[in-house]
């Protein structure tokens, strides 16, 4: 399966999200982790929280209300299925749906990026306002 096909699956997943930000605007974000072509985990934004979210947000003086972002939820789910040393073989896909046909920028926030680095995920592919982008996390930054 090609990366764009995986990202399209995550776009469909994002549509299922009903997370609402404090501003009242819906933010539909989905994330999936793949190890090669093997699907490991998927998640959507949630009004729930998790101790890991509190940890990363407090280090970065981030949101006062630590909502569980799709990226973090996918990492938490994957950590129950694979050993942390295997995250170095994974790619994180993130999509933000704006409406039925459009996507928006889904680059992970600072708190999620800290988790991505800590778990050693080397590649992130996410939607942008005009398509998609890929980021590679260098070894010294993980």
What is the role of each PLM region?
Residues 1-142:
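Zinc-dependent deaminase catalytic domain
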């Amino acid at each position: 399966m090609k990366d764009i096909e995986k990202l399209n699956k995550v776009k469909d997943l994002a549509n299922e999200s009903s997370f609402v930000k404090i501003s009242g605007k819906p933010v539909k974000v989905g994330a999936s982790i793949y190890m090669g072509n093997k699907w490991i985990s998927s998640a959507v934004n949630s009004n729930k929280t998790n101790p890991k979210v509190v940890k990363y947000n407090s280090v970065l003086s981030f949101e006062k209300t630590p909502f569980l972002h799709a990226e973090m939820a996918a990492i938490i789910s994957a950590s129950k299925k694979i050993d942390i040393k295997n995250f170095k073989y994974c790619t994180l896909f993130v999509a933000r749906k704006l409406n039925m046909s459009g996507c928006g920028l889904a680059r992970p926030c600072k708190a999620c990026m800290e988790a991505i680095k800590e778990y050693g995920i080397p590649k992130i592919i996410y939607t942008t306002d005009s398509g998609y982008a890929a980021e590679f996390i260098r070894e010294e930054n993980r």
